[in-house]
A protein has these predicted regions:
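Single conserved hydrophobic/aromatic residue that forms the stacking wall/gate
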Residues: 440-449
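Phosphodiester-processing cores and adjacent nucleic acid-binding clamps
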Residues: 1-441
Length: 449
C-alpha cells in the first residue's frame, strides 16, 4: 500500500559529515516503506542527484531533485525546480555561491536568490527556535522576524512558497505546529509536513553522531547539544508521518501536490552538441563524412595500400557513419576531432582510448590508433542503438600541456559551455579510523567501511 505522502526534506552523505546514508540506501528504504515520491535536498549541492535518480528509476519511485539553500541573511529553504529551466537556474545559483566561498562552503544572500526564482518551489524552513517560548527569552522578536521574512517570500513567488513543519519530538511540538499553522494562514504559505531526514534507518544514528563530532571537531563527551536530541530523523513510513499530523491533514496532502508539480527529471537533460565546427553550407553529418574520408585516405595512403582504402574498412566506415547520422551524434565526433586536431597541430601528445578504439571513424579522424584493417573491431561496444546511451570518447593529453587544450576549448565554445569533472571526497579505511579516533568513540568496524 502506498500512502499519500512524499518526503521533501532529505540529506544524504553528499551533505558531507551531516547526512548519514547513501542516496541508494534512502531509495531502498523508501521503496520498502511504500513511497511513491521522495526528494533529495542536500545542503547547497546537487552532487548526489545522479546516484539518487538512478536508484529511484530502478525502483519505480519519483525522484524529486532539489537542494537545501542556506543564506547569510535569512532562514534556510528547500528549493525544488519544477522543470529543466528551473534546474538550470538552481545550478547557476549554487555555482554563484560556491565561487564566492572557500572550498566546500557556499555564500549566498537573499538578494542573490531573486534572479533565480522562476520555476522554483520554495519550502521555507523555520528555525528550531520558532515558537519555543521555554527556550528563548526574545521569542517574540524571533517569531516576528521569521514571519516578516516568510511574507516577503510569498510576495516574490506567490503560489510556490510553502512553510515546512517538522516534528521536533519535544514537549512543545503541539504548540509549535499550531503556531506554524497560524503563520501559514496569515502569510499565504501553506504548511507542508517534512521530517528533516538525516539517515534512512534508526540504527544509523550512532554513525550520524560520529559525523557530527568530526564536523564540529570535538569528542563525543564534548559534543553535548551539538548532537541530535533523539534518533527520530530517519525515514519513517508515510503512515507514521500521517499519524503525526492528524490535526493537519492538509500538511500531508500538500506533499503530494508539490511532488506532482515537480515534473523535472534527470532524464530531461540531453546533450546539446556544438554546431560551429562545419564548413559553410555543410550539415554536421556531411562534414563528418568529409573529414572521415579525408582521414581514411591519409591512413591508407597509396604508398602503403596501392588499392586505396580496403573494402572491409570502407564497409565498416559507411556502417558506422549511418548509425552516427541516425543517432545524431555527428556534432560530438566533430567536437572531439577539433580538440585532437588542435593538439596534434601543436605537437601536444594525445591518444584516444577505451571503447572508441572499436571505431573505424575514430581511427580515420586521428582520435584513436587501432587500425580496423589489422584487428577486429566491435563497434557495438562503442555505440549501440539498443542501449540508447551517447558515445563516450576518452582522450588523454600530456599533463604538462593539458592547460593549452583547456584554454582552446574555452575560447572555441565559451567558458560557460565547458566543465571540468569533479571528484567526490570520501573516507577510506585509514582516514576513517583516524577521524574516529579523534572523537574517542568506539564503533563496530562495519561503520567504517
Amino acid at each position: 500500500h502506498i500512502a499519500a505522502y512524499a518526503e521533501l526534506n532529505v540529506l544524504s552523505n553528499f551533505s558531507f559529515l551531516e547526512g548519514g546514508s547513501h542516496p541508494e540506501e534512502l531509495i531502498e528504504r523508501a521503496a520498502f516503506l511504500g513511497y511513491r515520491a521522495i526528494a533529495l535536498t542536500d545542503r547547497n549541492t546537487l552532487a548526489g542527484v545522479v546516484r539518487f535518480h538512478t536508484a529511484a528509476k530502478a525502483k519505480g519511485i519519483q525522484a524529486i531533485i532539489g537542494a537545501r539553500i542556506d543564506i547569510e541573511d535569512g532562514a534556510s529553504f528547500i528549493c525544488l525546480p519544477k522543470d529543466r529551466s528551473a534546474y538550470s537556474r538552481l545550478s547557476k545559483l549554487l555555482t554563484l555561491g560556491k565561487r564566492r566561498a572557500q572550498k566546500s562552503m557556499c555564500k549566498l544572500w537573499r538578494s542573490d536568490i531573486v534572479e533565480y526564482l522562476q520555476g522554483q518551489i520554495l519550502i521555507i524552513l523555520p528555525p528550531l527556535s520558532f515558537s519555543a517560548s521555554k527556550l528563548y527569552i526574545d521569542q517574540k522578536r524571533i517569531d516576528s522576524e521569521f514571519a516578516d521574512e516568510l511574507s516577503k517570500w510569498v510576495e516574490q513567488l506567490s503560489g510556490s512558497v510553502y512553510l515546512s513543519a517538522s516534528l521536533c519530538y519535544r514537549e512543545d511540538d503541539d504548540s509549535r505546529l499550531a503556531a506554524l499553522q497560524k503563520l501559514a494562514e496569515q502569510s499565504g504559505a501553506p504548511m507542508v509536513a517534512t521530517n528533516d531526514i538525516l539517515y534512512h534507518h534508526p540504527r544509523r544514528r550512532p554513525l550520524q553522531d560520529l559525523l557530527t563530532c568530526i564536523r564540529k571537531q570535538c569528542t563525543i563527551t564534548q559534543a553535548g547539544f551539538e548532537l541530535e536530541l533523539n534518533a527520530e530523523r530517519y525515514l519513517k513510513s508515510p503512515l507514521e508521518i500521517k499519524n503525526g499530523y492528524e490535526k493537519y491533514p492538509d500538511a500531508i496532502t500538500k506533499t503530494i501536490e508539490i511532488a506532482d508539480r515537480c515534473e523535472f527529471s534527470m532524464t530531461d537533460i540531453r546533450y546539446k552538441y556544438p554546431s560551429v565546427l562545419t564548413r559553410s553550407g555543410n550539415s554536421a553529418e556531411d562534414e563528418l563524412r568529409v573529414r572521415t574520408w579525408e582521414g581514411a585516405k591519409k591512413r591508407y595512403s597509396i604508398d602503403k595500400y596501392p588499392l586505396g582504402v580496403p573494402e572491409s574498412v570502407k564497409k565498416q566506415i559507411n556502417y558506422e557513419l549511418d548509425i552516427i547520422e541516425k543517432l545524431k551524434y555527428a556534432p560530438y565526433f566533430l567536437t572531439v576531432y577539433d580538440m585532437v586536431k588542435f593538439a596534434r597541430e601543436r605537437n601536444i601528445l594525445c591518444q584516444g582510448r577505451g571503447s572508441a578504439a572499436n571505431s573505424a571513424v575514430c581511427y580515420c579522424l586521428g582520435i584513436t590508433a587501432v587500425d580496423p584493417n589489422q584487428s577486429a573491431v566491435l563497434f557495438e561496444r562503442f555505440i549501440s542503438e539498443a542501449r540508447g546511451e551517447p558515445p563516450d570518447i576518452d582522450v588523454d593529453f600530456e599533463h604538462e600541456r593539458r592547460e593549452e587544450v583547456i584554454q582552446h576549448i574555452y575560447e572555441t565554445y565559451g567558458r560557460e559551455r565547458a566543465g571540468l569533472a569533479a571528484t567526490v571526497v570520501t573516507f577510506r579505511s585509514r582516514s576513517a579510523i583516524r577521524a574516529v579516533s579523534y572523537t574517542h568513540l568506539t564503533l563496530p568496524t562495519s561503520f567504517l567501511v
